Amino acid sequence: MQVILMETVEALGLAGTEVKVAPGYARNFLFPRQKAMAATPANRRRMEQMRAKIELQIAKERGAAQEAAKKLEGVVCRISAKVSNEGRLYGSVTVGDIVEALAARDITVSKKMVLLRENIKEVGTYPVGIYLYKDVVPEISVEIVADEKAE
């Protein structure tokens, strides 16, 4: 089913674009939440009239994301965890741990925004991406330090 996105949907595309989706996804998710409308000739004309407004909204969102990226760039987040004598963690550092550590520094991000490339199971420094907008993904450093040595 062809639909026109009325707002940016992360998995599909930017507002104002026409995409093909499963009919059930359109009927049960996109249409009730007013995130998309059916791609009829009348709706295409309506979207052309709204295109300038949508482009302005996209520019604002991208600008806000780029400002936030400047603040996040170069941030080092330190997390202490219990480790063994070999430097391996008991368990692992999760996305939730990273979100909590950033919240302690007055940086608000959701778990969905944190892009963890690998499981963190050892002491060290790891690069972690923070998804802010489609092409705005600043990297922070997460440093895992030993809390106390286990016997």
Curated annotation (Swiss-Prot):
GO terms for biological process: translation. Gene3D superfamilies: Ribosomal protein L9, C-terminal domain, Ribosomal protein L9, N-terminal domain. One of its GO terms (cellular component) is ribonucleoprotein complex. Keywords: Ribonucleoprotein, Ribosomal protein, RNA-binding, rRNA-binding. One of its GO terms (molecular function) is rRNA binding. Disulfide bonds: none annotated. Belongs to the bacterial ribosomal protein bL9 family. Binds to the 23S rRNA. This is Large ribosomal subunit protein bL9. It comes from Desulfosudis oleivorans (strain DSM 6200 / JCM 39069 / Hxd3) (Desulfococcus oleovorans).
